[in-house]
């Protein structure tokens, strides 16, 4: 007789990383002719087996359970020991759940079948509850991902709009400041030029007044000298009066013409110098304005490139969001398929439970019949 009767171990996924798995029992389930699995009950306990199980502290563990216990000891995972009933011990940790049956379990002959049924129901309910918990957690994760994506999209759109508005305001303020500075510089240069022109004009008028005063003074002195020597040289002057007047007139005109030419040349030179200075200042101002304009245009081009890059990044983010939306759709379809699979597993479990109950009833009737026939034979022999 096999010393390991009906040991069943269920591994649960405590970290919720995958579907829970069932470890096979030492007794394989033979196939029914209809294609379904037929549960195998433990064989009846004989006297020899009771004599072998006389020690109360021993527990029957399959080789697979020994390997699992060695793995748990090596990984040093914390385990929880639950005493379900006398002779029925449940050991649970993060990786698996193991069940140990002792001698006290085999002493209960009358309640053996009901205990087996309760174990099977317990394991099935554990599997169903684990699947339901996994589905609930998956739904919560999907909802959290949807909320995170919506909040991230809103934050990115707000940040992009804020950056665009800041850049536009900065460009407008800089262009306004440059226009104001340029206008102020032009006004300042015009005022300086007007003031310089007024000063030069006043200086020229002052020089002209001074020269006219000198000319009048010389003319008056000449008339006084002429009057003083008029009597002495009247005869000479009478003879040479015409020549002298003519020469005087020509000389005066010549002197006036020379002075006029000299003043005109001097004024032309000064005006040319002023024009050169004015042209140089205007060219310098125009060069500065051109450089500032080029810098502004270059900065405007850079701002346009930055705006284009931001638009590209926005398109990339929108593409990523669309990809994540497709992933969410696939997750929803997988969730729907898992729900359908869970319903199908529930129906299969209910059918297996019904089949197990019928087989158990048949086995009980057969066992009663097998007990009844020897008792009748014993009664007949006694009689």
Swiss-Prot record:
Stretches assigned to coiled coil: 125-220, 276-359
Tissue: Isoform 1 is specific to germ cells of the testis and localizes to the principal piece of the sperm flagellum. Isoform 2 seems to be expressed mainly in somatic cells of the testis, and is not detected in mature spermatozoa (at protein level). Isoform 2 may also be expressed weakly in brain.
Protein keywords: Acetylation, Cell projection, Cilium, Coiled coil, Cytoplasm, Flagellum
Residue ranges with Polar residues bias: 51-77
Top-level division of the source organism's lineage: Eukaryota
Transmembrane regions listed in the UniProt entry: none
Sequence positions bearing N6-acetyllysine: 354
Residue ranges, annotated region (Disordered): 26-79
GO CC terms, sorted: cytoplasm; cytoplasmic vesicle; outer dense fiber; sperm fibrous sheath; sperm flagellum
Protein name in the entry: Flagellum-associated coiled-coil domain-containing protein 1
Encoding gene per record: Flacc1
